[in-house]
Amino acid sequence: MNNPFALFDLPIEFQLDQNRLSERYLALQKALHPDNFANSSAQEQRLAMQKSAEVNDALQILKDPILRADCIIALNTGEQQNTEEKSTQDMAFLMQQMQWREQLEEIENTQDIDGLMTFSAEIEQSNKEKISEISTALSMKDWQQAKLINDRLRFIKKLMTEIERIEDKLADF
């Protein structure tokens, strides 16, 4: 795995200085801009384009807390996260998922916009809590706990996308 932190000359930490990340991104993109390679060989132009794509990919990883956590875990353990792998050992969270899904389905069926706003705020709060928890787990190098929390964050992210879909649907009525 390429190390996006190294590419951006950033410490391998979950909490990132977003301003520094943006500054490094702009500097890298400026250095790799095609105009800088207009008089270069085709191979140098291709390498610059590949490096630019790497920079863009690395930025996406570093900006997304779930991908950033996956990256930190992989860099420290050598294990890649299998996002298709389902975590069924976390029965309490599995029950929570079912409850949230049922609640969201009920909100959609009854077209309860106020209920959706309340539910959305609850999920946003849960997301913030999990972000804080994963930050702690990663700083303590508790990779198993970090993986577990990141799985929860993945579910919450999907749920937030579903909330947005329902919000758009209800707004159209």
Curated annotation (Swiss-Prot):
Transmembrane segments: none annotated. CDD domains: DnaJ. GO terms for biological process: [2Fe-2S] cluster assembly; protein complex oligomerization; protein folding. Residues 3-75 form the J domain. GO terms for molecular function: ATPase activator activity; protein-folding chaperone binding. It comes from the Bacteria. GO terms for cellular component: iron-sulfur cluster transfer complex. The keyword Chaperone applies. The keyword Acyltransferase does not apply. Keywords: Chaperone. Co-chaperone involved in the maturation of iron-sulfur cluster-containing proteins. Seems to help targeting proteins to be folded toward HscA. Belongs to the HscB family. NCBIfam families: hscB. PANTHER family: IRON-SULFUR CLUSTER CO-CHAPERONE PROTEIN HSCB. Interacts with HscA and stimulates its ATPase activity. This is Co-chaperone protein HscB homolog. It comes from Mannheimia succiniciproducens (strain KCTC 0769BP / MBEL55E). The gene is hscB.
